[in-house]
């Protein structure tokens, strides 16, 4: 695998082949020079921290073949907004996602969404586990994905009104927290 953290040392001790670098196009080529195309790629709670999403998606498209499966878990924007989960937002996260923009991003690099699961408790709160594959693969996009993207549009994913509602909910929650703190002291 490809693992940029110190965890790669433990992986190598268990005789698992890995490259200790950040994932980018150059690293994907380095991987392919040494190993076969992967059957499964798992990416858990990393997507929000990636600063160059085009490079990331291009690299994924480069490293997979028609039998590869990509599994990405990330905090789901609609859950965060609907539930007012402002406490899940922090400085290391550069972006929060719904399926709609990710579909556009990955399709630019020949990758399709094939399915997803909603998780009430992912690595950092409510999340989506998204399954992706090469466009010309053995996989097809499920109706579930198509319906969810339609739902996101109907919900107003592209409308500022939804984000203003999140701001209002956040301010109300902060006000309640301040009242509780004031009553306690």
Protein language model features and the residues they cover:
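Flexible, glycine-/basic-rich loop-and-beta segments that form/coincide
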Residues: 122-173
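Short amphipathic alpha-helix with an adjacent loop that forms part of the alpha/beta core around
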Residues: 26-37
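Class I SAM-dependent methyltransferase SAM/SAH-binding core
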Residues: 1-27
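A conserved beta-strand element that flanks and buttresses the S-adenosyl-L-methionine
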Residues: 39-42
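Hydrophobic adenine-recognition pocket in adenosine-nucleotide-binding enzymes
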Residues: 46
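Conserved S-adenosyl-L-methionine
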Residues: 111-122
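A short glycine-rich, Lys/Arg-flanked "PGG" loop and its adjoining helix->strand segment in the class I
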Residues: 54-71
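Short, glycine-/aromatic-enriched active-site segment of Class I SAM-dependent methyltransferases
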Residues: 72-95, 99-102, 106
């Amino acid at each position: 695998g490809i693992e940029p953290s110190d965890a790669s040392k433990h992986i190598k001790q268990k005789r698992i082949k890995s490259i200790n670098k950040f994932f980018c196009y150059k690293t994907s080529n380095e991987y392919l020079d040494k190993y076969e195309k992967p059957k499964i790629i798992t990416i858990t709670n990393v997507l929000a921290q990636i600063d160059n999403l085009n490079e990331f998606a291009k690299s994924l498209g480069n490293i997979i073949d028609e039998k590869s499966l990509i599994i990405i878990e990330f905090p789901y924007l609609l859950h965060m907004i609907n539930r007012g989960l402002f406490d899940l937002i922090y400085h290391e996260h550069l972006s929060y996602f719904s399926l709609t923009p990710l579909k556009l991003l990955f399709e630019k690099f020949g990758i399709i969404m094939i399915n997803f699961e909603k998780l009430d408790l992912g690595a950092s709160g409510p999340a989506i586990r998204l399954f992706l594959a090469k466009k010309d693969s053995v996989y097809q996009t499920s109706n579930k994905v198509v319906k969810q993207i339609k739902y996101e549009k109907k919900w107003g994913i592209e409308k500022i009104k939804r984000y203003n509602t999140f701001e209002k909910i956040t301010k109300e929650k902060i006000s309640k927290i301040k009242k509780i703190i004031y009553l306690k002291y």
